Amino acid sequence: MSIINFWRQFGRRYFWSHLLLGMVAAGIGMPSLVSAHAENPSQTDTPSSQNRQSQALIAFDNLFLRQSVQNPASSFTFNYWQQHAVKNVIKQLSFAFTIHSPELMVKAKDEPSPVANVAEVMLDTLYALLTQAPSSTLVNLPISRGVLTENRISYHTGLWLAQIRGIRAGPYLTA
């Protein structure tokens, strides 16, 4: 029983913390390694999924840089862990769908499988999500003035929430 406790304590103290630290270090160091590798002219002989992975990582970093330049007030509001998770998904999908042996590569060229098509569609969709321009999520709702008069409005905050955010707080007011 003491061995089980030892491994449980080892995992809690060392393994999970070092695993998390390694994932963070890999996420921080990956874009610089990819951009240094992109200047290498021998990149054309790599498989297409690895090439797409490096393009997606660079495009994802540029997306956050572009957002911070457009809106300097919200330069610290992007979610680093979301960026890290998407990078890891692209990396894992790229390596999972890459054919390593030459015999399988020749066979895959002759007979396209539906799994390969799904892999290409997933990677293309992720890459498109990373490279598309960010869209505004604010919705302009029309503010109806004149329906309610000032003496009938008891809560100005509730009216503001109802008009701007589309939240109805309280009973309906009859006109």
From Swiss-Prot:
Domain of life: Bacteria
Signal sequence annotation: 1-38
InterPro entries, A to Z: SecM (IPR009502)
Gene Ontology CC: one annotated term: cytosol
Keyword Cytoplasm: yes
Disulfide bridge map: none
Keyword Iron recorded: no
Residues that span the membrane, as ranges: none
Keyword terms: Cytoplasm, Periplasm, Signal
GO MF annotations in UniProt: translation regulator activity
Localization of this protein: Cytoplasm, Cytosol; Periplasm
Pfam families found in the cross-reference section: SecM (PF06558)
Protein's job: Regulates secA expression by translational coupling of the secM secA operon. Translational pausing at a specific Pro residue 5 residues before the end of the protein may allow disruption of a mRNA repressor helix that normally suppresses secA translation initiation.
Family listed: Belongs to the SecM family.
Stated name of the protein: Secretion monitor
The species this protein was found in: Proteus mirabilis (strain HI4320)
Organism ancestry: Bacteria, Pseudomonadati, Pseudomonadota, Gammaproteobacteria, Enterobacterales
